[in-house]
Structures are given as structure tokens and as C-alpha cells.
Amino acid sequence: MRTPDEAKEFPRRFYDEVFTKRNVKYAEGSVADDVVEHNPLDPRMGNDKSAAIASLQAILDNTPDLQVEILDMIATGDKVAIRSRFSGSDSGKGWGAPMGVPATGKSFSVEGIDVVSIDSDGRFTDHYGLFDVPAMMQQLGLMPG
């Protein structure tokens, strides 16, 4: 069994590769084939590995200038909880695109929580992710405040 500090390295590297370096291919090797995405970005995508990868790609496509800051991490056993801040602008495909609204160009900054389970090979097997979507939509002018 890995130590809490060792367990924290998996999501830390994942965030760096995927969100900072915009390397979605890294996720393909870091997410188990049988992963369960418990809170998909769009429920119509499903909750499997392809949905997890598609969600990551959608986040990057919608926010080309995305910055993610890890604020806290707690690890125990095979689980790691990550509190983070996502900031950027709606300048890509547009967060309102599913509603027929083009990108607004406005900026947002919201916090989120991810809880992941990690297998013995260092791959994510479960992901629970929640971030403050209403606040983001309000900041982007896509929802009344």
C-alpha cells in the first residue's frame, strides 16, 4: 500500500499533464479501462472511460486559457480528494454551446472537488467530480445571478 504522499502524486501529475500541459493523451493511460465517472460533465456522454476523456477534452476546448490550481489534497488508502480552483475564459467552443449560445469571452474562477480511487498500477478507477457550475455560468453571463 502506498503512503498518502505517494497517492497524492498521481492526481498532482495528472492535473499537470492534462490541465497545465493540455495533454489529454496522458489521461488515456492514467484512467483504467473500467473507470466509473460518477459525475460526468454531460450525463448524455455516459460514465465510462470514453466519457471521462471526452469530459476532459470538452473542458480544454471550452477554456483554451484554463488554469487549475490545487488548493488542498487529502489521501487515505487508495482514495485522494482534491480541492482546486479552475479559472479561465469562455473563449473556445463555448460553455453555452449545448444551449445554442456561442462563447461569451467572459472569465470565470470557481472551486471544485475531485475524489479519485487509484488502483495498484496508478490508474484512476473511480472519479467523483463536482465544481460550482452555477457560479461559473453566472460569471459567464449564461445564467442570471
List each language-model region with its residue ranges:
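C-terminal and inter-domain tail/linker signature
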Residues: 1-145
